[in-house]
A protein has these predicted regions:
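Catalytic active-site module of serine/aspartate enzymes centered on a nucleophile-bearing elbow/loop
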Residues: 110, 115-151
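Flexible "cap/lid" loop of the alpha/beta hydrolase fold
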Residues: 1-16
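Acidic catalytic loop of the alpha/beta-hydrolase fold
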Residues: 75-76, 100-104
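Active-site helix-initiating loop/hinge in glycosyltransferases
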Residues: 98, 105, 134-135
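Short alpha-helix in the alpha/beta-hydrolase fold that links the catalytic acid
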Residues: 45, 81-83, 105-114
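Conserved alpha/beta-hydrolase catalytic His-Asp/Glu region
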Residues: 17-88
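Short beta-strand/loop motif that positions the catalytic acidic residue
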Residues: 88-89, 95-97, 101
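Active-site acidic short loop of glycosyltransferases
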Residues: 90-91, 118
Length: 151
């Protein structure tokens, strides 16, 4: 919640970036996002470290992170409106969700899918918030199948 507070979140992220090496930032983030960060392909980890080390626009990255944190609070405050917007989406939707996601509980994903039965929805055991990094071959297969069915 502290990251969602305007001004506080920006300062916290700036301080963290100053005192934490890129490799540690990536390791901590992956440990938060995945129950099995060791399964993430080493090339993806190396690319993430290089990106953090080379990024010139940290404000843009921080802004995206803070917007996500703040949107969770807005969602919690206005679920009915949010679900209505989801149901109104005119295009096909594929939602893949890790059952071990610590950031967005699988119960929330299941609730969204129940309200939108026209969506294609699948969960994966022992997968967290980043299935595209944790099980990239499976995600690639699901996207390919979904694309063939919908386009």
């Amino acid at each position: 919640i502290q990251y969602a507070i305007p001004g506080v979140g920006e300062r916290l992220l700036a301080r963290r970036r100053l005192v934490t090496p890129p490799g540690q930032l990536v390791a901590e983030t992956l440990a938060l996002c995945s129950p099995h960060p060791e399964r993430i392909p080493p090339g993806m980890v190396e690319a993430a470290i290089a990106l953090i080390g080379a990024r010139a626009d940290a404000l843009g990255v921080d802004r995206a992170y803070l917007q996500a944190a703040r949107s969770l609070l807005r969602f919690a405050a206005g679920r009915g409106r949010y679900y209505g917007l989801m149901r109104a989406l005119p295009m096909p939707v594929l939602m893949l969700h890790g059952e071990a996601d610590r950031l967005v509980p699988v119960q929330s994903a299941r609730a969204a899918a129940a309200r939108c039965p026209h969506w294609m929805f699948e969960t994966f055991p022992e997968v967290g918030h980043i299935p595209m990094m944790e099980i990239p071959e499976v995600v690639d297969d699901r996207i390919a199948t979904w694309t063939k069915l919908n386009f």
